[in-house]
Each structure stands twice: as C-alpha cells, then as structure tokens.
Regions:
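Predominantly the C-terminal beta-signal and adjacent terminal strand-loop region
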Residues: 185-256
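Residues that define the transmembrane beta-barrel architecture of outer-membrane proteins
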Residues: 27, 53-57, 103-109, 123, ...
Length: 256
C-alpha cells in the first residue's frame, strides 16, 4: 500500500474512533457559571452579625466532569473582592482608634473533587474538598491623619511593621463546602453553593504584626449557579453516568 493511502487510512480510522467516543465522553461534561458574593475572615473581627456589611460581588465559571453517578471533578475560576472595616465592629478600643480598613481583589483557580451522595427527585446535594491557588493585592487605610494617636508604643510599632511589610500576593488555599443542584431538564440545572477557603497567608488583609495572633486568613465564595450538560444530558430522565449508575428521578444512592 502506498504511503499516501496508508496515511489516509490511519487518519480515517482515528477520525472514526473520535466520532464514536465523543458522545460517550461528552455526556459526562457540564459547563456553568456562578454569581454571588465573596467574604473575608481574618485579623479584622468580622462576625456573623456584621458580615453583611463586608460581602462583595463575585462571579466565576466552571467545567465539571462526572466520573460516575456519585463522584465528579470540577475546575473553577472565581473572581471577587475582599473587604473589611473596623468601624463596623468596635470589638476593642485600640482597634477602633486604629480604624483600619482594606479592600483587595481575589482571583482563584481551584480543582474541586466533589461527592454527590444521593438524588432526591430533581434535587441533588453535593460536597467538595479541593486545592486552589489565589492571588490578591490589598489596599489599606488607617484613621488619618494620625492613626497611632493615643495608642501604646508597642501597638504603634507593630502598625508601622504592617505598613512596611513585604509579602507574597499569592497563596495556596484549601476549599471546603457544599451545595445543591436542581435539574430543570436533562440539559440545564440551577443551584446554590457556599464554600470556605483556608489560606496559607496572614496577609490577605495586610495585617500580621498588629493582629495579636498568628492564624492565617480565610475567604469565602457563595452564590447561585447555572449549568449546561453536554451529550447525553444530566440523566434527569435516564442514565447519564457512563458507568451504569442511574441518576434519574427518585432517590438514588452511590453505586460503587
């Protein structure tokens, strides 16, 4: 067989294989977007009662691959803003005098393995635990013109150290959270989710020396999701997992 003919046969073979396997893999893919809010927790004493003052808009996009009827793997990109202001809290006199506030963009790329323990009708809860990389760049403000007035010399010195601090503006983070999806039909789903991120940085807020502690900072993303399922859909009306697991209506438990 001539080389040109052989090349054509090989190309046709791989094209045929690609056409045959694409629906098998495509039916397990989901793409979506999130809209919601981002929230910070760290050296400024954000509390549940006052957290509403600190929530800022966030959004993201994700791609999720459903390995089987109980386990999936999601890659997600999020963007939001972290904000806190000590005037909202007043937990101690010296912090009120310090009058610190900060704002920082937060960008995240996360890999999120997730478990879907069961489906109840058209609703399906899930939990996730993963690994993320985040970047941030805090802008800070103290009481002006003299933020250290009437403060102890030691506190004044620590505030000066924080102002002059040199630190990395990237960090690894461990996302942990959960949510629920509602399957509108076999192509679309809407949902809600919330997750916290434990970071390995104490500088999301650019406070470290004057914090009075050594714990690293946290941030949170939460909101509503809208997603679309490729190929065979999400199985709302039948089997979609590609592994024999039925994720149709009713209560469905994991099959191993």
């Amino acid at each position: 067989m001539k080389k040109g003919h052989l090349r054509g046969v090989v190309l046709a073979f791989f094209l045929l294989v690609f056409i045959q396997i694409t629906p098998i893999f495509a039916q397990n893919w989901e793409i979506g977007t999130t809209l919601g809010g981002s929230l910070y927790n760290g050296d400024i004493d954000v509390t549940a009662a006052t957290a509403g003052n600190e929530i800022r808009f966030s959004g993201g996009i994700f791609v999720r691959y459903h390995v089987n009827n109980w386990f999936g793997l999601r890659i997600q990109a999020n963007a939001g803003t972290l904000f806190a202001d000590e005037k909202h809290f007043g937990t101690s006199e010296w912090k009120t005098k310090r009058g610190y506030s900060f704002s920082s963009p937060i960008y995240e790329i996360a890999i999120l393995p997730q478990v879907h323990p069961f489906r109840l009708g058209s609703f399906e809860p899930f939990v996730f635990l993963g690994l993320a990389g985040a970047s941030f760049d805090p802008t800070t403000q103290y009481n002006e013109p003299n933020p250290t007035a009437d403060l102890e010399p030691d506190i004044q010195q620590r505030i000066a150290l924080d102002k002059a601090a040199i630190f990395s503006r990237t960090t690894l983070a461990i996302p942990l959270g959960g949510g629920v999806q509602w399957f509108v039909n076999d192509r679309f789903a809407v949902g809600a989710e919330f997750g916290g991120r434990k970071t390995f940085s104490d500088y999301l807020d650019k406070i470290h020396a004057s914090s009075g502690g050594s714990a690293n900072d946290f941030y949170f993303f939460g909101g509503l999701t809208l997603s679309y399922f490729f190929g065979g859909g999400n199985g709302f009306s039948g089997d979609w997992s590609g592994s024999g697991g039925n994720r149709g209506g009713g209560v469905s438990c994991p099959k191993f």
